[in-house]
Amino acid sequence: MKIELDMHTHTLASGHAFSTIQEMAKAGAEKGLKLLGITEHTPGIPGTCDPIYFRNLHVVPRQMYGIDLMLGAEINILDGKGTLDADEALMKKLDIRIAGIHLLCYEHGAVEENTYGMVQAIRHPYIQIISHPGDGTAKLNFEPMVLAAKECGTLLEINNSSLKPARGKVDARSNNLEILRLCKQYEVPVILGSDAHISFDIANYQYIYELLQETEFPEDLIVNRSVEVFMNSLKKI
């Protein structure tokens, strides 16, 4: 399958990643991508950049080495109410807005509470992609999540990093298989994300491809196959 984009990556600015914007852009171009998303963590993650970083993104060129860039954030879902750790003023400054649950800053609840919070994030007018919903950090009911994504036009990510054996996320494989089967059933598009924290890992979808094959997931529901398909699928702000 041809891949033209990767929308979930991190640079040094996130505090625990290892490449610069230029290094990420160059690596993406060398891999033949046409579009790269750089999505730094918001303040709920220790060591990440301050909000002023996002307000100054206007100084960064949106094309380097022949590849287009979209600069944004991976915003934290904090609790079962769907509270986010970025305000509207910050989100307006971004090219792309992802939201996800992270162990370091999530207030865990029962499955029903976690699912409600996730659905609220999916319905948020500024959130365009949900990162690694299947990584098992919070227990979720996936069917309401998939149906909300279909209703709101928010893309659900299948995340390669969470599937790596070294990450130790024991439920990630079965969870992502369930999400893919539900998205196939309800004809909900997905986005593949590398979650690269170093340039060499950009557009690495090795473990995702195994799940796509196992579920016989339709290529026409994978938005990474072309920039045009992705942009047409992206929730408009």
Task: For each feature predicted by the language model, list its residue ranges.
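Extended recognition/assembly regions associated with phosphoester-bond processing machinery
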Residues: L5, K34-L35, P46-G47
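Short acidic/histidine-rich active-site segments
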Residues: V188-I202
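Alpha-helical scaffold segments that flank or form the walls of functional sites
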Residues: Q22-L36, N56-Q63
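Histidine-centered catalytic micro-motifs
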Residues: E4-S14, I38-H41, I130-G134, S194
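Histidine/acidic-residue-rich catalytic or RNA/ligand-binding cores of hydrolases
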Residues: G15-S19, T48-P51, K139-V146, A166-L182, ...
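Extended substrate/RNA-proximal surfaces in nucleic-acid metabolism proteins
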Residues: K2, T42, G47-I158, S162, ...
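N-terminal active-site segment of His-dependent metallophosphoesterases
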Residues: M1-K31
